[in-house]
Amino acid sequence: MKKRQEVYDLYWYFACERQNIFIKKLNGEPAPWTNDKILQEYKFCNSYRVNDRVSQYLLKNVIYNGKKYSDEDMLFRILLFKLFNKESTWELLLNNFEDITLKTFDVKAYSKTLESAILNGTKIYNDAYISCANKAFGYDRKHENHLALLNKMFNEDKMQSKIVKCKTMEQAFNIIKSYPLIGNFMAYQLVTDINYSEVVNWKEDEFTVAGPGSLRGIKKCFIDKGKMNNEDIIRYMYEHQDKEFKRLNLDFKKIGNRPLQLIDCQNIFCELDKYCRQALPDLKSNRTKIKKHYVPKKERIEYIYPKKWKI
């Protein structure tokens, strides 16, 4: 394994500085929360995936909304939300059906509600999210195929009864990725979100999948991976985080007593790729610009975490 030291050190700097920004905003400090011009100008995900807006919405409105749900309803709710990954789409369905459960799930009715939203010019999918679009179930519209997928998973195959029996994240990942419209990275995101709930309690440090953005980040960070694969590299970062923060004199502020997890280390590679487009433009890359500028949101988020994390 051969590191590109400048980029490797930037990985740890970025993780620490992005977390510092999060903490300062959380404490109500005024902007700018950093002297880093790139972090001031462009939008970057949090160092901890769970602190991102959509993850927080999922926790508060889909999983821990104060109501009791059966395991199968909870799994259904998480997958439905994540296939669209957009708060307004969830709220649209919630306003049209008494609650989002398998009992109220009707492919035609849900589809009709979403179709009229599209005709009114409403976006029902999150732009930043890769969700496979093909006509796997024979429909022209992406949302119809996704609803048909949920119907196959939960009503026809009773996939929920297999998921609750899974002992590891990887077992569940293999079940979910066997379905059409679900790629490896999407399946990894879904099992991570399921693991936020009380339905399962899988270990987080046993399994990871490198997404497209993180592959670009890894390529910039390592000149040669040696005998390691991309997932080994992510695990290497996870296992060496304390040592590296110390080496670089970086005071990384954990949430509770929780270090960065494999999925966080994976995500940081993706953000590092974006950061390097501005910081080190000479590095060879297929993508040369960061698409999104930072726009401050007015409403403050009250952060919550899965109960089992004891934060």
Regions found by a protein language model. Name each.
Residues 78-86, 153, 176-179, 194, ...:
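Generic structural signal for hydrophobic core residues of well-folded globular domains
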Residues 194-250:
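Phosphate-backbone recognition surface of nucleic-acid-processing proteins
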